[in-house]
């Protein structure tokens, strides 16, 4: 199917919220990881979200120029073509963008999509993330207001992170402490600044103990029930039931019960990067170890072209990552829930 239109993306999010499921948002860094994500969604009969971080976009731009906009646009254009071959709806998103990278990433991409919309085309991306979690909340929300207005004009949804997620994601890092929990007051201030849909739709990455990266279960205290408190606190103030569309960041190592509680309390999008990176890399490492005398020219031998052909190990990587995407759709209940 074509990349999701703004109308289809809104329908996807509405269906997820009503059905208490969420879409895996898969970080990609190449055409190969993109194909793996799309394959996983197709095999699971799940619509989904594919996203590009600032680091991913820089990598896609090539190590000569490292231009984030070029990298993101190139993969997005490729995605618009290749997605036609998959029987599911896919939304394109850009992941964490801190203040110092806005002018080199999200703002130019918003301007590009605005021009496309003015020309009668759809936006290149369906949503963008502003990560102001390192900024004071007042400054964070002031920038979010500006970006939300621009995004709305381009028919794009904005994702905002108002309080820190622990660990590190593309250079944005936070300590693991009590600041990792969004308060009802934080949520009310967000609603006051950004509205509850009338100023443009946004996704809220609230913090409930989340940590980016790899950690063992039990090392971090997740409180997904906090999302219910945030929704109820804002609903009591503004009179709108379940006002927020929540995003779950830093979910590696989460238990199925924690994920289930998050879904019951309004999460519609959950980011996956660490787990899919490992799933992609593991079979490649296995292939190299098992075929070291073929992928290397050892003791004067010439190796085995079939062993070191990137397509050989690349197919293994794609299949493994796709399987991890399928698993994610099952945990998040989006499997079998594609828009017919």
UniProtKB/Swiss-Prot annotation:
Binding site for Zn(2+) 2: 131, 161
Keywords, ordered alphabetically: Glycolysis, Lyase, Metal-binding, Zinc
List of residues binding Zn(2+) 1: 96, 212, 249
Residues that hold dihydroxyacetone phosphate according to the record: 213, 250-252, 271-274
Residues annotated as transmembrane: none
EC number: 4.1.2.13
Keyword Cytoplasm in annotation: no
pH dependence: Optimum pH is 7.5.
Protein's pathway: Carbohydrate degradation; glycolysis; D-glyceraldehyde 3-phosphate and glycerone phosphate from D-glucose: step 4/4
Signal sequence, renumbered to the chain: none
Pfam families reported for this sequence: F_bP_aldolase
Cofactor descriptive note: Binds 2 Zn(2+) ions per subunit. One is catalytic and the other provides a structural contribution.
Binding site for D-glyceraldehyde 3-phosphate: 53
GO cellular component: cytosol
GO MF term list: fructose-bisphosphate aldolase activity; zinc ion binding
Top-level taxon: Bacteria
Cofactor annotation: Zn(2+)
Catalytic activity, as annotated: beta-D-fructose 1,6-bisphosphate = D-glyceraldehyde 3-phosphate + dihydroxyacetone phosphate
Biological-process GO terms, alphabetical: glycolytic process
Active site: 95 (proton donor)
InterPro entries: Aldolase_TIM, FBA_II, Fruct_bisP_bact
Gene3D superfamilies linked to this entry: Aldolase class I
Record's function text: Catalyzes the aldol condensation of dihydroxyacetone phosphate (DHAP or glycerone-phosphate) with glyceraldehyde 3-phosphate (G3P) to form fructose 1,6-bisphosphate (FBP) in gluconeogenesis and the reverse reaction in glycolysis.
Family: Belongs to the class II fructose-bisphosphate aldolase family.
UniProt name for this protein: Fructose-bisphosphate aldolase
Encoding gene per record: fba
């Amino acid at each position: 199917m074509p990349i999701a239109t703004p109308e289809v993306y809104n329908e996807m999010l509405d269906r997820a919220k009503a059905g208490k499921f969420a879409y895996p948002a898969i970080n990609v860094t190449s055409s190969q990881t993109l194909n793996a994500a799309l394959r996983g969604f197709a095999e699971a009969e799940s619509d989904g979200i594919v996203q590009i971080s600032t680091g991913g976009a820089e990598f896609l731009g090539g190590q000569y120029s490292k231009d984030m906009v070029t990298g993101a646009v190139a993969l997005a254009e490729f995605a618009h073509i290749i997605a036609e071959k998959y029987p599911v709806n896919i939304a394109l998103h850009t992941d964490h963008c801190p203040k110092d990278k806005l002018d080199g990433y999200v703002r130019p991409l918003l301007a590009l999509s605005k021009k496309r919309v003015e020309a009668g085309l759809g936006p290149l991306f369906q949503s963008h993330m502003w990560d102001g979690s390192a900024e004071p909340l007042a400054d964070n929300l002031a920038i979010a207001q500006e970006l939300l207005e621009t995004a709305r004009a381009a028919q794009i949804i904005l994702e905002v992170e108002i309080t820190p997620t622990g660990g590190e994601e593309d250079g944005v890092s936070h300590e693991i402490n009590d600041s990792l929990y969004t308060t009802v007051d934080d949520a009310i201030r967000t609603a006051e600044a950004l509205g509850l849909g009338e100023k443009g739709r946004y996704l809220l990455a609230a913090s409930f103990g989340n940590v980016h990266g790899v950690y063992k279960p039990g090392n971090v205290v997740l409180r997904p029930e906090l999302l219910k408190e945030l929704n109820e606190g804002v609903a009591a103030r503004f009179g709108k039931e379940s006002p927020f569309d929540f995003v779950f960041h830093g979910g590696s190592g989460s238990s199925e019960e924690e994920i289930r509680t998050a879904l019951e309390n309004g999460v519609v999008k959950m980011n996956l990067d660490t787990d899919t990176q490992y799933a992609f890399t593991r079979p490649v490492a296995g292939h190299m170890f098992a075929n070291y005398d073929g992928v290397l020219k050892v003791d004067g031998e010439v190796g085995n072209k079939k062993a070191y052909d990137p397509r050989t190990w690349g197919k293994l990587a794609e299949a493994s990552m796709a399987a991890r995407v399928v698993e994610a759709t099952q945990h998040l209940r989006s499997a079998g829930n594609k828009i017919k």
